[in-house]
């Protein structure tokens, strides 16, 4: 079964302008076998949000906030910070 994705088109455009990462690029992170998924309690309110960090098809290390239900709903996507990149590289494969 393949994942199905959805997002708000206005939010996607604003995200690309602000962070330089399109949601089309962001969904490719879900295909990275070394990607890591974490719960995001700080940003979870009435819904449980999660974060995935991994390499996109463009080889950018990308952090994606999402909600998983029948479909994966993207909330935001951006390139990982220097600190996030270091933590990812130290923990990948473990």
Language-model regions, residue ranges each:
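Ribonuclease/tRNase effector modules and their secretory precursors
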Residues: 1-94
